[in-house]
Swiss-Prot record:
Protein name: Uncharacterized protein C1198.03c
GO cellular component assignments: cell division site; cell tip; cytosol; nucleus
This protein's record includes keyword Iron-sulfur: no
Major subcellular site: cytoplasm
Annotated localization: Cytoplasm; Nucleus
Pfam families on file: DUF4646
Lineage of producing organism: Eukaryota, Fungi, Dikarya, Ascomycota, Taphrinomycotina
Keywords: Cytoplasm, Nucleus
Chloroplast is among the record's keywords: no
């Protein structure tokens, strides 16, 4: 797909929803292990690339070649899309190359015409992109060579034209932006990628708001309030893990 066909491309605005807000539901690698009944999840780059390529279309010609199969799925215009509370999916570890948990949310996504197969394809795509997270350090020739892996030229062009020297994890953001435009947004959903630095910023904002809500003024009272906040958020307070934030529009 030629980047010139996408005239409305712009760098996605930062997410305005704080991932530490009380109405946000959190999903971690431990939830994935519980759902799959597995103690160990294979998160190697080989597995990520294999699934990412398998879920793409190569038998047809034209603009659909190399794109996820879900993109050819027609949107149901008459469907009534039910809003749902934001879902925050934590990366499997503090190393983003290990990807994100593969968990489907039928009570929310099915009502937006997003099947388990669609969601699985998306996570596999993101995880494949996570395997290439070091691409930001590559030269232009190496980036363009990624097309040989079956990656859409759309994503590579998006990186070259929109993210060079402007954002971290450009390939991951390019993949997610492609899915948002081609699949999620028409189905009244949107996914944000929030890196660990952005998580740390949101955490600081959340702690400050909590301190202000408690009416703290002195250093000692602020310290106690911060400790209370950490205790309340102990399972999700890590700033080392990146996040995917899934919201309804």
């Amino acid at each position: 797909m030629d980047i010139k066909d996408e005239k409305a491309l712009t760098i996605e605005k930062a997410c305005t929803i704080n991932v530490f807000a009380p109405f946000v539901r959190n999903v971690t690698a431990e939830d994935e292990k519980a759902v799959t009944n597995k103690k160990h999840i294979n998160s190697s780059a080989t597995v990520h690339v294999f699934h990412g390529v398998v879920n793409r279309t190569f038998k047809t010609k034209g603009n659909t070649v190399g794109l996820p199969k879900s993109f050819s799925k027609a949107v149901i215009e008459t469907l009534s899309y039910k809003p749902f509370a934001p879902i925050c999916i934590h990366s499997r570890s503090d190393e983003v190359v290990n990807g994100f948990p593969l968990i489907y949310f039928p009570e929310d996504l099915a009502s937006h015409d997003i099947s388990g197969k669609d969601w699985k394809s998306f996570i596999h795509d993101v995880n494949m992109a996570c395997s290439f997270s070091d691409v930001a350090l590559m030269g232009l020739d190496q980036i363009l060579n990624l097309v040989s892996f079956g990656l859409s030229a759309y994503v590579i062009s998006y990186y070259v034209e929109k993210y060079v020297d402007k954002a971290k994890f450009p390939i991951i953001k390019g993949f997610i932006e492609m899915w948002n435009r081609k699949f999620f947004n028409p189905r009244k959903t949107h996914v944000y990628f929030i890196n660990s630095d952005e998580v740390a910023e949101q955490r600081a904002v959340s702690i400050k708001a909590y301190q202000q809500g408690k009416g703290t003024k002195g250093l000692f009272s602020k310290f106690n309030a911060q400790r209370e906040w950490k205790k309340q958020h102990q399972d999700i307070s890590s700033t080392q893990h990146s996040r995917l934030l899934l919201i309804s529009l």
